[in-house]
Amino acid sequence: MPESGLPIRVYKENDMWHVDYGEGETEEHTSLEEAESAADAVAQAEERTVVIEE
């Protein structure tokens, strides 16, 4: 995972929700809820913030 402190981006593109952890590391999800849950888990463990771009 990238350095602690960098925000985690959640955004929608081509009908998929993407979680961008930084440094090219991303995940795809079918719903905003799934993407938020994944991002929140990492953010809490690494003391990072989540930015949701709707």
Stretch-by-stretch model annotation:
Residues M1-P2, A41:
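Aromatic-residue detector
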Residues P2-E25:
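Short aromatic-glycine-(Arg/Gly/Cys) micro-motifs in beta-strand/loop hairpins
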